[in-house]
């Protein structure tokens, strides 16, 4: 399964002007591949991620997720595809203060339809996979920033997505915790064979990405390929 973006263009009105946020962008990310998109604020990274997540419709171009062209889908159809195939790791974990780590996973919509036993087993396995084995019953205030981001990642994986979209995962973390999170994302990408796009302004730890592309003024250019 893969994510294929072809000739994407996104514009926004700005008074009498039209601003181009994404300008003829083409990108393919295959299963088991981590692609890092770097660039300064305002370069179009967030708009690109929103289009890839089917949260924003492009002016033109194609978004294909797991072989499904999203252009012909209704809003409800895009929502169903997103729920089934896309995991999103937001910059801020936005965890519920009253819930433990395992309860954060159990509260995810993806867990519905499974038995309670299956849900708890799956949640425990996800938390173990992100390095939080033994911390399932801790609440957000009992976890470090890096640990909260790990819960965020586990929650995004709860639907067994084929595509994982990650927005600035290291923004609020120090150097060491940021490195650990990027290493974890690379490991999860390989083990779960997901197509991962990580948007970041942080140019550290990029050696863990399979490919690094730069976004400036809405356009992409290849920087390097590590594998």
Go through each PLM region and give its residues.
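The feature captures the beta-strand-to-loop junction immediately N-terminal to the Walker
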Residues: 38-40
């Amino acid at each position: 399964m893969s994510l294929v973006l072809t000739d994407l263009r996104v514009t926004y009105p700005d008074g009498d002007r039209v601003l181009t946020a994404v300008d003829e962008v083409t990108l393919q990310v295959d299963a088991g591949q981590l692609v890092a998109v770097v660039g300064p604020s305002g370069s179009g990274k967030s708009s690109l991620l929103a289009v890839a997540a089917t949260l924003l419709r492009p002016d033109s171009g194609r978004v294909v997720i797991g072989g499904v062209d999203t252009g012909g889908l209704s809003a409800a159809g895009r929502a169903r595809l997103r729920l089934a195939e896309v995991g999103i790791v937001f910059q801020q974990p936005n965890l519920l203060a009253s819930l433990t780590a395992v309860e954060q996973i159990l509260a995810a919509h993806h867990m519905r339809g499974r038995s309670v036993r299956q849900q708890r087993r799956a949640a425990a396995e996800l938390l173990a996979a992100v390095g939080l084995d033994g911390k399932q019953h801790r609440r957000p205030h009992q976890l470090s920033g890096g640990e909260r981001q790990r819960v965020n990642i586990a929650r995004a994986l709860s639907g067994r997505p084929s595509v994982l979209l990650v927005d600035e995962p290291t923004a609020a973390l120090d150097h060491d915790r940021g490195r650990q999170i990027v290493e974890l994302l690379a490991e999860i990408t390989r083990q779960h064979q997901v197509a991962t796009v990580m948007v970041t302004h942080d140019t550290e730890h990029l050696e863990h990405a399979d490919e690094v592309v730069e976004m400036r003024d809405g356009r992409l250019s290849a920087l390097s390929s590590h594998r």
